[in-house]
A protein has these predicted regions:
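C-terminal domain-tail junction helix/linker
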Residues: 161-213
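Extended, low-complexity cationic-aromatic segments
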Residues: 1-87, 193, 197-199
Length: 213
């Protein structure tokens, strides 16, 4: 946790810090009936019944200083797709500038093929957040914006419709990117975790995450 927060509070010079994660199994949902639009005196409504038309997984990297996001959708979220995304980042940031990647310790990120690729590309430096601490990864905040504004109330008749909505949101965001500013120190976070543990013992213990290779 210390090194991740250190990157946020004091980013290294002559290097880039990217918060990386995948939003997996995003569903393309089509409502069975049209919703009623928002109007004066009445909230917009939509049916709770829906049809599923498949899923996609979004890999995204948030550059913390400018707030720009690089994202790509894939059908699955195995180590093969993660490697493709790493190659995309390698092209997106050409040259030899060091790239510090903040991510969780999901098994896909530690696959042998990924480790071998990283050995051949030493400018990629990985920083893993502690288990069950995805809130430390700033790209999760961006995922929240994406979900609220482009996915949650959307109507998607195909996976392609869903991907088009995600890509449109990405394009609009990057025209006027907004960085997420981190202010909490390690000491303040540690104190809050101690307080939570006193209130609800065991609530800060790591939880296992299903692995996908």
């Amino acid at each position: 946790m210390t090194d991740v927060i250190g990157l946020y509070l004091n980013p290294p010079q002559q290097a880039m810090v990217l918060c990386v994660d995948e939003k997996s199994q995003i569903q393309a949902l089509d409502r069975t009936q049209p919703g009623l639009p928002l109007k004066k005196g009445r909230c917009g409504t939509m049916t709770h019944d829906y049809k599923r038309h498949g899923t996609t997984t979004l890999f995204a990297a948030l550059e913390i200083l400018q707030g720009k996001v690089i994202g790509q959708c894939y059908q699955r979220h195995r180590h093969q797709e993660f490697l493709k995304f790493l190659r995309t980042l390698d092209k997106e940031f050409p040259g030899q500038v060091p790239l510090h990647l903040v991510m969780d310790n999901y098994g896909t990120h530690k696959h042998e093929n990924v480790r071998n690729w990283l050995k051949r590309h030493p400018r990629f430096v990985l920083h893993f957040v502690p288990t069950s601490s995805s809130w430390l990864n700033l790209v999760e905040r961006w995922f929240g914006h994406l979900d609220q504004k482009a996915i949650r109330r959307g109507v998607f008749r195909s996976v392609e419709d869903l991907k088009a909505s995600i890509e449109a949101f990405l394009t609009a965001w990057n025209k006027d990117p907004k960085p997420f500013v981190w202010t909490a120190t390690v000491e303040s976070i540690t104190e809050k975790l101690r307080t939570l543990e006193k209130i609800q013992p065991g609530c800060t213990s790591p939880r296992r995450r299903k692995r996908t290779t």
